[in-house]
Amino acid sequence: MAKLSAFADEVTESFLEQVKYLAGEKVGFIEPRFINKKNIMDLSKAELDEAKKMIDDYGLKVSAIGSPIGKVKLDEPFEPHLDKFKHAVDLAVFFETPFIRMFSYYAPEGKNIDDYREQVMERMAAKIEALSGADVAMVHENEAHIYGHSAANCADICKSVNSPKLRLAYDPANFVWGEKITNNVEVCWPVMKPYVVHIHIKDWKLGAGDVGSVPGEGDGQIKELLAELAAMNDDGCMTMEPHLQKGGQFGGSTGPELFSRAIAAVRELAAEVGLACD
């Protein structure tokens, strides 16, 4: 049975209200990213303890750490960034989640990221080393302007690094917004499917700017993707990130009413295609 999760910072800035909201919507997982307006990577020990208690008190589990790892340019120093990744590993262990969401770097200013393949692979390999001994894996999200902007490049990362510690988070809307693809299930999904363990539910209309669509109403083929998951008897997490008020490089906003509408739409679409969804 597939499981719903959410970037609940799109609902409200208050973390207590985030977990209350998800519990009320009967969404059993959360993907923490911004907690009381602070990135999860920047929280103090006391703030982390408080967040963990709220999650536990409302009966939620963590689908992945919503980290911004990999959203830096390749000409920035790597060691401080690797240290941040090691902290993300500690956070995953602390929040008892198997995954860290991450990205595959931007090119130096004015350069083409596809020309930096070797450097990307070296950094990914270094992060695999940092995962040694932890029951945690990276899930790389396809996104515009990073090396993994295309399905082929995402698969290339997994094939080249060749480790079960590196898998993919599939975001259909990012192919619409960044690659101008409106048939991602036909042309992107088959390429990435062998490595996908995590799904982002976000829909988009081609040319819509920085505002997403209610799932099923854009060009992201959400219903078709859910049908693919149903055929696989998928039991992973589908993380809601609808961006129905605005979206940006490091997050977005939706608000409670629109978020509830998005959740209802996904549940309805899942039922239509026979995807068991909790």
Please state what every model-predicted region is.
Residues 1-8, 12-28, 52, 56-59, ...:
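Histidine-acidic metal/acid-base catalytic patches
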Residues 28, 32-125, 133, 137, ...:
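Structural motif corresponding to the early beta-alpha repeats
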Residues 6-7, 39-40, 76-77, 115-116, ...:
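A generic structural signal for short
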Residues 22, 89-92, 131, 229:
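Hydrophobic pocket-lining residues that define ligand/cofactor binding sites across diverse proteins
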